[in-house]
Amino acid sequence: MKLLHSLSTTTIFSLGLLLCSSAMAQSNNEEEEAIAGAMAAMDEFMVSFNARDPEAWAASLNYPHVRFASGTVTVWDSAEEFAQTDSFERLQRAGWDHSHWLTREVILVSSEKVHISTVFQRFNRDNQPISTYQSLYIVTKVDGHWGTQARSSMAP
């Protein structure tokens, strides 16, 4: 009888461990998929930004889209509204030609939201750095689409 009880306890304990490890593996897979989706969205953001393509850039975001910069908070409710911004003209007047990520560090992750601390650099047409900024990007999955939903930047 004692052997049967011992086997039963061992079996229950083993099943519990199996269920816990399965849940942890699923959680890790969800987090890895979320990080991959968020990083792809950030790549899309930078490629469309450097291409000076306002519609593609707007499509790399989720809405409402929020940007904290230069002491202000700007909210765009739609891709159409965002695509009307004059960011490219303003940046080109300041000597900007293109940008790229220096670092991207995931600091929080769930299956549908990833917070990424970034450092990016802006360059002139001679590929000389003109500025470097830290930012925090919040990338979300909305209706199956990964896109940047909020940015807080030290850039003007």
Task: Walk through the language-model features, giving the residues of each.
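Short, low-complexity N-terminal intrinsically disordered segments enriched in polar/charged residues
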Residues: 20-59, 63
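Short, cysteine-centered beta-strand-loop-beta hairpins and adjacent loop/turn segments enriched
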Residues: 94, 122-130
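Bacterial N-terminal signal peptides
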Residues: 10-20
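Hydrophobic/aromatic beta-strand elements that line small-molecule binding cavities or substrate pockets
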Residues: 101-107, 120-122, 134-140
